UniProtKB/Swiss-Prot annotation:
It comes from Prochlorococcus marinus (strain MIT 9515). Keywords: Ribonucleoprotein, Ribosomal protein, RNA-binding, rRNA-binding. SUPFAM superfamilies: Ribosomal protein L22 (SSF54843). This protein binds specifically to 23S rRNA; its binding is stimulated by other ribosomal proteins, e.g. L4, L17, and L20. It is important during the early stages of 50S assembly. It makes multiple contacts with different domains of the 23S rRNA in the assembled 50S subunit and ribosome. Gene3D superfamilies: Ribosomal protein L22/L17. Pfam families: Ribosomal_L22 (PF00237). GO terms for biological process: translation. One of its GO terms (cellular component) is cytosolic large ribosomal subunit. This is Large ribosomal subunit protein uL22. NCBIfam families: rplV_bact. HAMAP family: Ribosomal_uL22_B (MF_01331_B). Belongs to the universal ribosomal protein uL22 family. Part of the 50S ribosomal subunit. GO terms for molecular function: rRNA binding; structural constituent of ribosome. The lineage of its organism: Bacteria, Bacillati, Cyanobacteriota, Cyanophyceae, Synechococcales.
């Protein structure tokens, strides 16, 4: 059973209907999951992927939620969970030769990032 003092506060932010496939967003989220807020921002700044811009926006929104709503310090925040789910697909057609048409699928995704305060190392050392 979890005691009330052991429960951690989480701040969550969602980005919905983001243009780009969920699989391409997941490859970036897998690299920043579990990192501190500062380390994640540095990693996102230097990654060569297009999906880093909306991920950065959602991450900053989650940190702003933690700071404003829960009173947490941004320097002590860690990304506890990050996920990307499929959104609706916009279907378009590309005209081709001899009256044919090829379909184009413009994919969207929903990004969810939650942050929580990092566990204090002094408390864990005292328990050992």
């Amino acid at each position: 059973m979890i005691k009330k003092s052991e429960m951690t506060k989480k701040a969550i932010a969602h980005g919905k209907y983001i243009r780009g496939s969920a699989s391409k967003v997941r490859r970036v989220l897998d690299q920043i999951r579990g990192k501190s807020y500062r380390d994640a921002l540095i990693m996102l700044e230097f990654m060569p992927y297009r999906s880093t811009d909306p991920i950065t926006k959602v991450l900053r929104s989650a940190v702003a939620n933690a700071e404003h709503n829960l009173g947490m310090e941004p320097s002590s925040l860690v990304i506890s969970s990050a996920s990307a789910d499929n959104g609706p697909v916009m279907k378009r057609f590309r005209p081709r030769a001899q009256g044919r048409a090829f379909s184009i699928k413009k994919q969207t995704c929903h990004i969810s990032i939650s942050v929580e305060s990092a566990p204090n190392q002094t408390n864990t050392e005292a328990q050992n």
